[in-house]
Swiss-Prot record:
Coiled-coil region(s): none
Record GO terms (molecular function): ATPase activator activity; protein-folding chaperone binding
Role summary: Co-chaperone involved in the maturation of iron-sulfur cluster-containing proteins. Seems to help targeting proteins to be folded toward HscA.
Protein name as it appears in the record: Co-chaperone protein HscB homolog
Gene responsible for this protein: hscB
Amino acid sequence: MNHFELFNLPVALDIDLASLKSNFLSLQQQYHPDKAADKDQALIKSSEINQAFKTLSQVDSRAAYLLALKKQDHHLDQSISDFEFLQSALELREQLDEATSSEHLRTLRLEVQQWIDGLVREFKIDYSEEDWSEARDTVRKLRFFQRVLNDIDKAEDQLLDDEDSFDLDDDF
């Protein structure tokens, strides 16, 4: 049984994330080790459910998993050789490093999301045409942007922490 089947979802890049979450919570309850007669087996199943959920939750890992189902996921860890992309990626990283406000981070997030949306469209075309080399390249780019989104989240958290500690200092 693949991850999509586990959560009763179509084998596709576009999935209903609310259904994924709902089915995940239901399966978590069903296979919770504390409620099972065979705790070891329930622990294994629970771990599989958690891993499948993590994989399907993010578009980059979901795309990579789709390639894995077609046995086309080899060399996904190779570096990206698209010079224009690398140049844009470097500029984006510099903008993130220089971001000092929530507004700047929001703008950056929107830009990254636009990149991701474009790459998702590219992946769907590559996947449907079975252009595996291009699909793998697109997954590599999606992974890069997912990491940037994660770093934006961290930067936002850091800004909030800094603002909170600054507000505390104002009270003294």
